[in-house]
Amino acid sequence: GGAFAYVGAMQDSFPHALELSKKGYNAFALIYRPGAQTACEDLARAIRFIFDHAGELEVDTDCYSLWGGSAGARMAAWLGSYGAEAFGGGNLPRPGAVIMQYTGLSEYSESDPPTYACVGDRDGIANWRVMQARLEAMQQAGIDTEFHVYSGLGHGFGLGTGTSAEGWINDAVA
């Protein structure tokens, strides 16, 4: 996250990657350049790097997922919709799932992967109704979705520890 102006890695990326790693998943946190286009290009290049070095990194690239909060959620969704090739990453498989937190993104494509999304009901930046409408439209297009709104939470709740969102990451990986 960070509105494409800065990278909120300490709140979202690093804690999420660490938690996923504890659950036995390979996880990478990306520090990207500001700006929507350049951030997506950086994500596409990172995916390309992981695919090109999968053996060396000892990772399985089958059915990978993209995770992001706020601006990072948009990046994950756009790569899910348009693929890495649209952002200079070459012809790679699209993610098997997108996990997104607190973003007001409404656009989607009928080729989007299954999507899990969550947001707080007091988010002054990302209106939960926009996320809900997006996921409902995706469901109507035949895309599997799961959506959660957490009571009393604003923008940027991260892992949700000690809040109504605690444990959301377990739902997302289930």
What is the meaning of each model-derived region?
Residues 9-28, 135-136:
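Short amphipathic alpha-helix adjacent to the substrate-entry channel of hydrolases
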Residues 113, 127-137:
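Short alpha-helix in the alpha/beta-hydrolase fold that links the catalytic acid
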Residues 139-174:
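C-terminal catalytic histidine-bearing segment of alpha/beta-hydrolase fold enzymes
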